[in-house]
Structures are given as structure tokens and as C-alpha cells.
Amino acid sequence: MPQKPARCYTKRRSKAFSGPPYTRKEYIHGVPPPKIQKFVMGNPHGDYDYIVEVYVTERGQIRHNALEAARVAVHKYLSTTIGDQNYFFRVRVYPHHVLRENKMMAFAGADRLQEGMRQAFGKPVGTAARVYPGQAVLEVRVKKEHLDHAKEALRRGASKLPLPSRIRVIPLKEEAKAAA
């Protein structure tokens, strides 16, 4: 059965994310593993001048395959334009939330086979990361001469995300002073 479109899972229109029942993976059988496996790429030991990050402006859920698509787009652009040793890229969210689907059949005679809304809890079909306004999703650290390439890479990655997002640039020297 094909995957449902992202609009089915992206926005939670009911009350705030109070949390559905039974979300711990050790209690849910058959949770598919997330497609995204690598969360850190590039050179983590470099001396960088800027942090460029993509943050969302609305609350919602980002599915694991959207995170993987954004990661691949950003990593491919950065590695081909500035090289693997000139940046540090990190995905800042993890898809903990388990998505379920109550499968419905749509063919002749399906009413004899399916239960309708009886026992409609659903089977796990994927995972998603829950995000809130202002939360960073992707982060790249670069030197000043590669700042424009980092912005373009994150613009390409942000186009793969289902929520409206923006890019912010943080000078790293000021952030170190604020943390101290």
C-alpha cells in the first residue's frame, strides 16, 4: 500500500501536543526504523565563524523521510561546492514520534473483510519529529568565505520540509560569549 501524503501527518489541528498514548518504542511492536541514519556530517573539529540554521515558524511534525531528503540535499550541495573538510552539518531533531494508520480497503466486497472503526487504533507506519516555532531543524557551521554556499544549501534543504521555515545566521564568536 502506498504512503499517505505528508499533509495527513504534518499539522496537528487538535489541542497542543499533549502526547498520544503508548509512544515509547519498547512498548510498540513493529515500529519501522527511521530512514535517516546519519545526523552529523562534515568536519566537527574545524574552526568556524558562523552557524547557519533552518528553523520552523509553525508547530507540526516532520516525517523521517522528509528529514532524510533534506539531509541528502544539503550534504550533496555542500560536499560538491566547498568540500567535506570545510563545514560541519548536523540534523538537530530526531523522529521519536510513532505514526499509526488504520488501513482501510477500497475494493468490491471490502465491507465483509474489514472492521471499519472497530478496534481502529492503527499499525505503526513510520516516525516523525515534533517541532515547535523557533526550533532549529538543520544546522551548518562554516567559515566566512563559505557563508553564501551554506545559505544556498539550507535553502535547498528547507524546500524538502513540510513546514514553513526560515534561515538564520549566528556569528559563532558572539554565541561563545553568550554561553560563557
From Swiss-Prot:
PROSITE patterns to which the protein is assigned, alphabetical: RIBOSOMAL_L10E
Domain of life (superkingdom): Archaea
GO cellular component, as recorded: ribonucleoprotein complex; ribosome
GO biological-process terms attached to the record: translation
Keywords on record: Ribonucleoprotein, Ribosomal protein
CDD domains from the UniProt entry: Ribosomal_L16_L10e
InterPro entries from the UniProt entry: Ribosomal_uL16, Ribosomal_uL16_arc, Ribosomal_uL16_CS_euk_arc, Ribosomal_uL16_dom, Ribosomal_uL16_euk_arch, Ribosomal_uL16_sf
GO molecular function, one term: structural constituent of ribosome
Classification via HAMAP family: Ribosomal_uL16_arch (MF_00448)
Family membership: Belongs to the universal ribosomal protein uL16 family.
Name of the protein described by the UniProt record: Large ribosomal subunit protein uL16
Gene name of the encoded protein: rpl10e
